[in-house]
Amino acid sequence: MILTLAYFMLGTLLLGVFAEDTVSQIGINDSLWYPYDEALVLKPLPNNDLLLSFAFQLQSEPFDPAVSSMSYDAYEHYTTFPRAIPPLLESTATRQFHLRFTRGFWDALSWGQLPHAGKEAGASGVELWSQVQAMDQEQAFHNWKKLSNSLSGLFCSSLNFIDESRTTFPRRSYASDIGAPLFNSTEKLYLMRASLPNEPICTENLTPFIKLLPTRGKSGLTSLLDGHKLFDSLWNSISLDIATICSEDEDALCHYEMDARIEMVTHVPSALARGERPIPKPLDGNTLRCDTDKPFDSYQCFPLPEPSQTHFKLSQLFARPINNGNLFANRPTRICAEVDRSTWTAFLSVDDTIFSTHDNCFDLSNDQNEGGSGYDFILESTDTTKVTPIVPVPIHVSRSLTGNGQDRGGMRIVFHNDNDTPVKLIYFESLPWFMRVYLSSLQITSTTSPQLQENDIILDKYYLQAADRKRPGHLEFTMLIPANTDIVMTYQFDKALLQFAEYPPDANHGFEIDAAVITVLSLESSSSLYEMRTSTLLLSLSTPDFSMPYNVIILTSTIMGLIFGMLYNLMVKRMVTVEEADKITLQSGLKYKLLKLKEKFLGKKKTKTD
């Protein structure tokens, strides 16, 4: 026993010495880093707005698509890639999917184009599209439904409400820049898309998103992400893109790539004011921004334009600094500022030390943050009106409902091209089944070029009629908008009646209509250049009086109570005259019983006295 214990202690000591020597030999250039990149880009916008773009890129370990995870020789190894994603992709035969959570309004006139040419943003609410491998469309929809249900539980959203009445199969829209592999040559890839325009976006969707990242909100850029700050912005978008990439080598190994992004636009003075005054209260007179040229006794305060000078820290916007960089990635955390260098200056603050670079990009090295106080990013400007050039959108599109009846209505779409060159685009629209569109009522007019005809504008037309409760209306046009021209497209539709159980709890509020998707194409190669969405619409349908059943129940109960009372009285009571009733009352009342009791008592007392 003593000898065994001695051998054990000696082995432990040797193992500790070997481990200590091994750890001391591990350097920063060793092969223990993992494929994970994170970056933050800050871009000042006009009117003291600020665009913040968080980007996270991950890559899974290689795998052989010919080996199933259920086989005896299969193994799975995870590093930084989330473990919940690969089984989901394999069980649903999904080769790639794209998920968007978007809230707010993007001001294209002031802010220009969307980040990343609009390909990382979605429509208001929740939007999902994916490529699924299957034998036929029925099997593809089964896998699609399974995918949406799984993502619903993973991100705490209402994606489980996606059914066949909300799903469309785009023909030319939503084309991916990355080709999806086909693991079985006898099957095909099906592209499916669905949207929930009335889905509220909240912290319950952000928290699972952060948990997919390896830092999990504890370090790196994810330590900045807070639901209160993110959803208190003017516009925000959470995007998740996962694709299957296969090599063309002989081994034919594949891997998954995950691109997660968070974009937000915040108004800097408002964000700073919330930090200074968490509880709203009136401002002092000396802090009001008023025009002193106006009469001092005027009843109205004339606000001045936005302040042209600013100085703020990233910790003031998010109420916390960056908690170190990532400790395991093959590249350090990176922060960049896209600013006009003539009036803007960017600094990195580390342990009360300020750094600057020529390109306003900073790598967060953990060797610099020895004090452990975290990193802070500082932006200051002497003239906030000077920002980097705003790239205008290639085309402006607005959509609205027409008509005021409860049985029919119309749609009006305006395309405004203020460029000197024509714009080629794909107009995609998914309409609910209760909007019965009359394609024969489609009209194309132009206020600037009245001679234009429908064939001059619409190059290709695809329309799939909706089926009641089974399929939405699918409208997809390839259009060419001439230069410096306004095009108005209108069509009419009927409003179908819904069943009683199909109305939502807030039926009088209206029904949300999906946003239209516009994909701007290149005139030479027809490749996608820019993507944008219109705003969602609110359609009013004939709504029944839901209080009527309750009124009927109350009225019926009252009448039945009256009838039952009358019948009950006739059954248990006897009909007598008034005189007999008075006599019975005198002989059955409480006063009569007291008199009888008194007489009885006095009679007994008199008998005893005698």
From Swiss-Prot:
Component of the GPI transamidase complex. Involved in transfer of GPI to proteins. It holds the Pfam family Gpi16. The keyword Glycoprotein applies. Present with 1680 molecules/cell in log phase SD medium. It comes from Saccharomyces cerevisiae (strain ATCC 204508 / S288c). The keyword Lyase does not apply. GO terms for biological process: attachment of GPI anchor to protein; fungal-type cell wall organization; GPI anchor biosynthetic process. Forms a complex with CDC91, GPI17, GPI8 and GAA1. Glycans are attached at residue 184. Residues 573-610 are cytoplasmic. Belongs to the PIGT family. One of its GO terms (cellular component) is GPI-anchor transamidase complex. This is GPI transamidase component GPI16. Residues 20-551 are lumenal. The chain crosses the membrane at residues 552-572. It is a single-pass type I membrane protein. The disulfide bond between GPI8 and GPI16 is important for normal enzyme activity. Residues 1-19 form the signal peptide. Keywords: Disulfide bond, Endoplasmic reticulum, Glycoprotein, GPI-anchor biosynthesis, Membrane, Signal, Transmembrane, Transmembrane helix. The gene is GPI16. It is found in: Endoplasmic reticulum membrane.
